[in-house]
Amino acid sequence: MLTYKQRQSLNHAICDYVRQNEGSDELLVQLESVLLPNGSDVIPQDPNLLERKWNSIVRLQSKIMELEKNCEELQKSIDEQQSSTNQISNASSDWCPRDTPSFQITLDASITALCLHPSLPIIFIGLDSGKLLRYDILNVELPLQSTMAHMDGITSISISLPNENGRPAYLATTSKDLNTKIWELELDSTLSHIKTLAGHEHTVSDCQFFERGADLLLATCSRDLYLKIWDISNGWCIKSFQPHTQWIRSLHVHGEFVLTGSNDSAIRLTHWPSGNGLSMGIGHDFPVEKVLILIPDPQHLQPQYQPLGFQHVASASRDGTIRLWKVSLPKFIPHRPPRPNPLDTTFKVIAVLTDHNSWVRDLRQFNDMLFSCSDDGSVKCWSLDWTNLSTTTCKKSWDLSNKGFQNCLTLDNIAFTGLPSRKLLFSGSSEGTLTSFMR
């Protein structure tokens, strides 16, 4: 037996059916008088609710089956994506660029600095003319943006990431014009100049963004012998000291420690908040062009080096060599800044790599590989064995000498960004040629 509401719904459906199929008015009046004697008792159907008709159960079952199918397809897609991500990650850990370049573009001045955007297919290029270019690496016919950033050559570029508190991404450029400029990156990577950091009295050689707590800081070094730490929020210099007696050409910051290389042919490790010099490496015959703190997998870091966060560094020099060093461990005293160990203040040379035939200009780490470029026109890839760095050998070499001296390199800085690594390597030459190796 049907309930009253069910009978009313059935009767109303019959009348609707006759009406929609153009039944005669006389028939419709007769049906309504018999089936719906109290038409006002019928509550109108809410269009936002599921229809209460006899086929509603069938429709509901069909909808359930459709949703289940969609869920299965989505789960399959997620599983495939995770599998693909794992394959990319595994492939990237031992990735080595192809034998031939993916593309080359020639610009109107020597390329002196390169920097990849950590997530977008964008590369920033600094020229010796002071021009800053922004290119889409998937379409390099024309630059996305060209800015005369400095009055003299750009020497380095560093990029920072936005944070959860709304801080935007920034780009820093240093130059021979004695200035460091800070640029804000919009969501589409468009550059807007926001401030100039003036304080150095000679060429600013290198820079690097790094975080300390919630603060974004920038380290710069210069031919005026000073290394400076800047607070980006207000543009103030919060620390300034002299780690070397000659031109500081390169720096690399890791936490509270900064590694520097100089024209005095030495490299030094300093605790920058206190300015305490901790140890140094002596062995190069000519000025040091580039220094790099080597970040190993956590399992390869010895327990006593945990407070430092690393135990090996690399340096590239005009003597044509790359040296791998083991850092002497400073003394860590609770509630005090670290101090040099009086019994061990000198780095130990682990390996001297001599495959380059001229000045070695730049160094970059990619997982267990070290990339270098030189005035001999070559780019080289070195295989790092963390258990025995003395066995480091050249894994692959690319001869780009027909494009001039190779001044600089860039690839994804995995340790800094924490983002998935991409199979990208770029080299910039003295003749203005950007060479790309993709996959």
Swiss-Prot record:
This is Nuclear distribution protein PAC1. Residues 55-90 form a coiled coil. It is found in: Cytoplasm, Cytoskeleton; Cytoplasm, Cytoskeleton, Spindle pole. Self-associates. Interacts with NDL1 and dynein. Its main location: cytoplasm. Positively regulates the activity of the minus-end directed microtubule motor protein dynein. Plays a central role in positioning the mitotic spindle at the bud neck during cell division. Targets cytoplasmic dynein to microtubule plus ends, thereby promoting dynein-mediated microtubule sliding along the bud cortex and consequently the movement of the mitotic spindle to the bud neck. One of its GO terms (cellular component) is transferase complex. It comes from Kluyveromyces lactis (strain ATCC 8585 / CBS 2359 / DSM 70799 / NBRC 1267 / NRRL Y-1140 / WM37) (Yeast). It comes from the Eukaryota. GO terms for molecular function: dynein complex binding.
